[in-house]
Amino acid sequence: MYITQMRIKNYRNFKDLFMTFHPLANYLVGENDIGKSSFLRLISFVTRARNVDEIEYDDPHQPIRIDLEVQLLEGAKEHFADTPDDHRRAIRVRLEMRVSDIVPRLYDLDTGEELPLETIRRLRYVSYSALSQEDAEVRPQVYRALERRLAQWEASHCGPIPQDERCYIQHEVNVGTFDSSYYECIFYLSRILCRSNRHRADNLKFISLAALRVITQIYQMANSLAVPLEHNIIVDKDGKRYLPLIISIDEPEIHLHPYMQRSILEYYQQLLRNEDASFCALLKDLFGLDGLRGQLFVVTHSTDSLIDDYRNIVRLYRDHQGQVKAACGSSFHVKREIEKHLIMHFPEVKEALYARSVILVEGETEFGCFQLFGQTVGVPFDYYGICLINARGESSIAKIKKLLEYFRLPVVALYDADVKEAHAKEKGVYFTQGICFEQDLAQTMLQKGKRQALDKIIDAACGTTGRTSSDMLKKACHKLQLDPQDFPPGPLYKAKAHNGAPLWVPYFAWLYSNKGVILGRLIGQSLEKQEVPPAFAKVIHEAGRLATV
């Protein structure tokens, strides 16, 4: 079971927000205070079929309307345990809340018929946030009951907890805020779920904690009279019983380092995909369940948490009217060949999902100097929210630009002028004045009378006096369609203009043959505002303008 799409009207800053979702995992990204955590809170209200507080209404005089499309069952022979004759695979409903109502009303979107709220309560929602203490909200009696059940199960499989571990549990009780049963549950689960690929204590501790949180919620559902568990259980054609769950995790980066963030999020997905055999066996023995079916929602401001697939991303952004909208990776329709490139390049552009505008450059030297150029020309990238991406070649710029534009990100791309004919009609594209970045730099520095400064940069980059070789000059002259015989090799500071040959060519030859991030940083640190080539400054200022729109 999973939510396929949702339309939200009049909830907080969501005047009219449409979203589509991936069936397995969805990562919500975007700027601060745009409504990502508010969305998770709304899911809680929807799945419990409860009204929100008056302060949650954008306009209290109008209702909040949430249109949902939910995939209930996977096949025509499946059914819910309490309605064996109902085989509806999907529903389209509207949940309508009014300030004056105690509970919301539920309608069938296709017929307009009012439905019982039990229909939407088939969705069960479990939320975790690093900023709140869900564990502390669970009554100690629940942990004690689980401790007894886990102890019986574990004793028949692994044996009792050793004395040294019991001493550690008592220490945690003395210094912590939980009953001893809470810590014993974690230790029991750590032994039950232990595998060869979970040898590190911290890995196992957090994985056990994740499992305990899920089991605790299922235990409370199983013992609840408000919504009987049978109302939620799906029975497949083979008689196997599955509990559908929607799990949300808010800001996992707060207490976890990057590797642990990814490990824990992947483990939650494994639980929802029933890939942990020990956990499935535990569900079977404790609750008579053969597994889970679920959907994961993650709100994060960390690129370390993000999955490397654009199809799992939901980016919230503001349109030109200031309204919150969503760009959903699951709804992008692209050809298979393009999709392959989008997935391949996505790891390089994850940080851009949090940006206000993006600059794409072709190579490493540009990448090394542009952020420093931004400081120099008065457009600091971090302050403006500008993301700089190295496309690692002209051919990748268009593909990365397309992906970013799918996510409604303003993009400025800088190409070398030698490919101008192929890209001149594209939107948001700029070109160097000379044939490439290195020519612009060499010409600008010499025109500004900064030859000595350029010599200093080159000498610092190579650790000795910069000089050109015959190979450098041949390569450069081939690019420029000049005769290398007009440019004898040697130290750059001795280079002279003769026979009408321009002086910037030897400098271009050296720069063209020594591209790299370190050189780029030296250039960025050394140039004054008036020395930044105009084509580069123009791109930076345009990115700054887009970031403030």
Regions found by a protein language model. Name each.
Residues 1-48, 198-348, 546:
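Switch/communication elements of ASCE P-loop NTPase nucleotide-binding domains
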Residues 28, 126-128, 297, 314, ...:
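Hydrophobic/aromatic beta-strand patches that form the interior of the parallel beta-sheet core
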Residues 29, 38-87:
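Conserved P-loop NTP-binding catalytic core
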Residues 54-56, 74-159:
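Glycine-rich phosphate-binding loops of NTPases
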Residues 58-61, 118-121, 227, 237-241, ...:
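Conserved catalytic network of the ASCE P-loop NTPase/AAA+ motor domain
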Residues 62-66, 88-93, 120-126, 243-244, ...:
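Short glycine-/polar-rich loops that comprise or flank the Walker A/P-loop
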Residues 128, 132-249:
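Extended helical coiled-coil dimerization/tether regions that scaffold
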Residues 345-360, 364-549:
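Acidic, Mg2+-coordinating catalytic modules of nucleic-acid enzymes
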